[in-house]
Amino acid sequence: MTSIHVITRDNRAGYTDVLEEYFRLRHDVFVEERGWRDLARPDGREVDAYDDDHATYLIALDGGRVIGGLRLYPTLRPHMISQSFPHLVRDGRILRGPTVLECTRYFIVRERRMGRADCRLLAAFQEFCLEEGITEVTAVVEMWWLPRWHQAGFKVRPLGLPTQVEDQPCIAAAIRISEESLHQVRRMAGLRGPCLLREASPLRKVPHVAA
């Protein structure tokens, strides 16, 4: 059974091996599979400037093995859209705020993409954001993500026009966080309730405002 773990600076010391596997899988997916050669590293770990203490990870585990994950980052800090992709946003108006996060490095391992792992991670994404008071999440994605999000019940608005990135048409978009979207994606994932796992003692709410 797939479980989705919330990893922050508060508990990442207990997830050292999990994060190491996640970073190596990111290299496999984004460098080796998708061909994003600018991200290649000789140690086989895809790590960047946003893998710092402000990052929150939702990691999908099955039998102790990482099968997927994503990274969330506060938009009141310099983040990927503001630093690398401002040209993808109409009029350069970067969507920021204490209730807005950026999502990057989403993946499901190749052998699990035909099952429900993808929908479970998307459900965990909506669940986490609702719990944290997040209203929207921004992302730069390939265009084929839009029908997938629509099928999952996500409400998405473009922030600009499609642009070629790494030889793929990509778009900056904002996902609205809502109970309605959570209920629909839970149904698709075969879930009857919450799917997030946090520490045994409840984590304090994740800080989204730049310290």
Predicted region positions:
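Short, His- and charge-rich active-site/binding loops that engage polyanionic ligands
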Residues: L61-G92
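Short amphipathic alpha-helix that is part of the acyltransferase structural core
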Residues: M1-E46, Y57-I59, V66
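Short, solvent-exposed loop/turn elements at beta->coil junctions and helix N-caps
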Residues: P42-A49, G160-T163
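Acyl-donor binding region in acyl/amide transferases
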Residues: M80-C170, A174-I175, E179
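Short connector loops at helix/strand junctions that flank enzyme active sites
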Residues: D53-A55, R65-I67, R96-L101
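Conserved GNAT-family N-acetyltransferase fold
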Residues: L58, L70, Y106
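A short helix-loop-beta-strand connector motif used in the catalytic cores of GNAT acetyltransferases and
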Residues: V47-L58, M80
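Charge-rich, low-complexity intrinsically disordered segments
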Residues: Q168-A211
